[in-house]
A protein has these predicted regions:
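A eukaryote-biased signal for short, well-structured alpha-helical docking elements
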Residues: 235, 339-342
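Beta-sheet-dominated interaction scaffolds and their linkers
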Residues: 341-359
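Cysteine-dependent hydrolase recognition
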Residues: 1-335
Length: 359
C-alpha cells in the first residue's frame, strides 16, 4: 500500500515532464511477495481504478510492470541492503526539490528503505536543500531526542530546508489521503476530481499545503479512512518550516528587470519592467522599520508604479520582484529631490531653559 501511494505521485510527476528518482523497497514479505498485485488491503481496486490505466494512468495495473524495486536478502536476514548508503548518496548527488518517504518510520529513522539520524551528519548536499515529506510514524516527534526531522533541519548547509512529519504513530490509509492532499495543493491537476477549487498556480508552499491537506482528508472519503483516523492525522502532522516558505520546482532562473536608477520624491511614481506574472513590491525605511508602499503585478512591459506617500530624500526606495521558479530580485534606489530640504539627525531638549535644539 505504501508503494501504490508513492508511485501514484511519481507517475503524475513523470506525466508532467519531471524525472523522479525512486528508491523503492519491498517490505518484509518473507519471500512471499507477488508482483502481480499492488496490495491485498480492502478497496485496493478503487484506488487502482482511479490512479491506474482505467483512470488517470499514473500507475500500471501491477507493480511488476513498473519494476525497479529493491529486494531484501531474506536468507541472511538482511533487510537493509545498504539502504542508508543508497539514500545518502542520492541526497548528496541530486537531492531534487522534494525528498519524500512513504513507509514505516519512528523517532529517528525511516524503515524501508532504511535511513536514520545517525546518517544525517554524512550529508553533503550543500546549497541544494530539498523539502522533506516524511510520511510515516513519529519521525517528527520533536519532544524525542535526536528525532529525524530535527536532525535534517539542524545540520548546517545540508539536509533539508524544512520537513513535514508526524509526531507519533499514524494511520497508514489516512496518511495516503493526507499526502495526496499535499500534492494536490502543490500541483492542482494531480487530482482533477478532488481537492481544492482554488487556483494555486503551482506555488509550492509546504506550510499551506499541510493545512490544505488536513481540509482535504475531511472533504474526501478515500477508502479505509474514518472520522477518528482523519482527526488523528490532522493532529499529528506538522510543517517544520517558515509559514511562507516557497519552493523552487524547477532550477530557478534570473529575471530581466529594467527600472529607473533613481527616484525623485516629487514624482509619486516609479517606472519598472518586470516579467508578466511577477510580483513587484516597493518599500522604504520608516520609524518602525521597513514599510511597504505599493505592490503590483508585472506585465512584461514598462509600467508605472504609484508611490502613494511623500518619501524623505536621503532615504532609500527598495524594489523587490519575485516570481515562481525565478531568483528573487532586490535593488536599493536612492531617493532624491530638486527642492531644498532639512534633515534632522538628532535633537536635544533642555528642561532648565525650556529649549528644544535640533541638529
Amino acid at each position: 500500500w505504501f508503494q501504490i501511494c508513492a508511485e501514484s505521485i511519481n507517475g503524475y510527476l513523470s506525466s508532467i515532464g519531471k524525472d523522479p528518482y525512486r528508491i523503492s523497497k519491498i517490505h518484509y514479505f518473507q519471500g512471499n511477495y507477488s508482483d502481480s498485485i499492488w496490495s491485498t488491503a480492502d478497496n485496493t481496486d478503487q484506488i487502482l481504478n482511479y490512479f491506474g490505466p482505467n483512470g488517470l494512468n499514473y500507475i500500471p495495473s501491477t507493480p511488476g510492470e513498473l519494476g525497479g524495486f529493491l529486494a531484501p536478502d531474506y536468507e541472511n536476514d538482511d533487510y537493509s541492503n545498504y539502504d542508508d548508503t543508497i539514500v545518502r548518496n542520492a541526497i548528496n548527488q541530486n537531492p531534487g526539490y522534494v525528498l519524500m518517504n512513504r513507509d514505516h518510520g519512528w523517532y529517528s529513522l525511516w524503515d524501508c528503505p532504511a535511513f536514520g539520524s545517525e546518517m544525517v551528519p554524512m550529508l553533503t548536499n550543500h546549497n541544494k536543500l530539498p523539502f522533506v515529506l516524511s510520511i510515516n510514524c513519529a519521525s517528527g516527534a520533536f519532544g524525542n531526542k535526536n528525532c529525524l526531522t530535527e536532525s535534517l533541519i539542524k545540520i548546517e548547509n545540508a539536509g533539508g530546508v524544512g520537513v513535514i512529519a508526524p509526531t507519533f504513530e499514524t494511520h497508514t490509509h489516512s496518511n495516503d489521503s493526507y499526502l495526496w492532499g499535499v500534492w494536490d495543493f502543490f500541483e492542482n491537476d494531480f487530482l482533477p476530481d478532488y481537492g481544492t477549487s482554488v487556483e494555486n498556480n503551482n506555488n509550492y508552499m509546504p506550510a499551506f499545503a499541510n493545512v490544505s491537506a488536513k481540509h482535504f482528508i475531511y472533504q474526501q472519503n478515500f477508502p479505509n479512512t474514518y472520522q477518528n483516523t482523519r482527526e488523528l492525522t490532522s493532529n499529528l502532522f506538522h510543517a517544520h518550516c517558515d509559514a511562507f516558505l516557497k519552493l523552487y520546482s524547477e532550477v530557478p532562473q534570473q529575471m530581466n528587470i529594467e527600472h529607473d536608477n533613481s527616484y525623485y520624491s516629487e514624482n509619486k511614481s516609479f517606472n519598472i519592467k518586470a516579467p508578466a506574472g511577477s510580483i513587484i513590491g516597493s518599500s522604504t525605511e520608516d520609524y518602525d522599520g521597513i514599510k511597504t508602499l505599493a505592490i503590483a503585478e508585472g506585465t512584461g512591459s514598462m509600467q508605472s508604479i504609484n508611490i502613494p506617500e511623500h518619501l524623505n530624500p536621503e532615504n532609500n526606495l527598495y524594489i523587490t520582484v519575485t516570481k515562481t521558479n525565478h531568483l528573487r530580485y532586490e535593488q536599493s534606489i536612492e531617493i532624491k529631490t530638486d527642492n531644498a530640504f532639512v534633515t534632522m539627525e538628532d535633537f536635544f531638549f533642555d528642561d532648565n531653559q525650556h529649549n528644544l535644539i535640533f541638529n
